[in-house]
């Protein structure tokens, strides 16, 4: 059963990915590290107060499981409350509430395995695929990954 409790996380990094998307990294407190251990392809539900209202959205983790910082990519959506906040307002040092990682879009990885993986993604749907590919290539260096990607 997925945990439904939110934990305060500090924004550790922000970097533009495109003209309408940012990558946001989080500092995970030592006391929460086990709860926030993630598998490739999982997502975070992030919550913040916007205009006096609590707004939460889910975003795919785009970092690999061995990356030093957990990151999500957030694409701006016209009229999107949280996506515009993330792209325009949020800054390093801000605190947002996050649920521990959830989701099952991942393969069980094991060092020494030699498998073939095929991913098909379009647009911002690439974010969980990036996490999977990075993790596969690190954990199973003999495996082969093929990506079919389409974008406007």
Functional labels for PLM-detected ranges:
Residues 2, 84-152:
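FNR/FR-type flavoprotein reductase catalytic core
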Residues 2-95, 99, 115, 151-152:
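Ferredoxin-reductase
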């Amino acid at each position: 059963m997925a945990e439904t409790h939110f934990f305060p996380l500090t924004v550790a990094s922000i970097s533009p990915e495109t003209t309408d998307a940012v990558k946001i990294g989080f500092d995970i407190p030592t006391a929460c590290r086990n709860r926030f251990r993630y598998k490739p392809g999982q997502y975070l539900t992030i919550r913040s107060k916007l205009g006096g209202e609590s707004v939460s959205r889910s975003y795919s983790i785009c970092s690999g499981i061995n990356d030093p910082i957990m990151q999500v990519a957030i694409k701006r959506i016209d009229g999107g409350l949280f996506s515009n906040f993330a792209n325009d307002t949020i800054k390093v040092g801000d605190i947002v509430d996050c649920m521990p990682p959830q989701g099952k879009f991942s393969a069980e990885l094991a060092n020494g395995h030699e498998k073939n993986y095929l991913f098909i993604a379009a647009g911002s749907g690439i974010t969980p695929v990036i996490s999977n590919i990075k993790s596969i290539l690190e954990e199973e260096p003999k495996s082969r990954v093929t990506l079919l990607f389409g974008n406007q």
